[in-house]
Amino acid sequence: MSKRNNVSYVKPAEPSFISKFKKDVCYKEGPTVDTKRQELPILSEDSDGSDKEDEQPQVVVLRKGDLSEEDVMKIKQQIKENTKDEEAAPSDGKILFKKPVKRLSGDTTSGVNACSTKKKKQEDTKESSGTKSSQKQVKNSSLLSFDDEDYDD
């Protein structure tokens, strides 16, 4: 058993023709086991996920009433403050659940009632075709049955 603990791998020397070929081709050595075990340096980025200055969108003001860059920065700051206030956990550590606001039946149907005339026409045609197809099925069922004796019982 002690022989197993002393086993190690020794990488043989690379032949000269292979090293010459790699040099001619400009071969770059791939990652090895040791390089994969190395820890990557941690990037020092903001943890809040904010964009860097050069990655932020460019603000173009066309009219007097448009938002300026300063206004956008103020709004972003207010949003960050609001989210921090909402995310703050209670001091006693208990999680509190809020009851959802009940919706009135009129509120949910008010947006759904706005329907185009094209959709109404399609629904009407579907209903009329549904009655016609049921009549056709009755006629076809008598024509297509092969065992009339089984159904006459």
Curated annotation (Swiss-Prot):
Lineage top rank: taxon: Eukaryota
InterPro entries associated with the record: DUF4604, KIAA1143-like
Compositional bias annotation for Polar residues: 106-116, 130-144
Disordered as annotated region, ranges: 30-66, 79-153
Record's compositionally biased regions (Acidic residues): 45-56
Name of the protein this chain belongs to: Uncharacterized protein KIAA1143 homolog
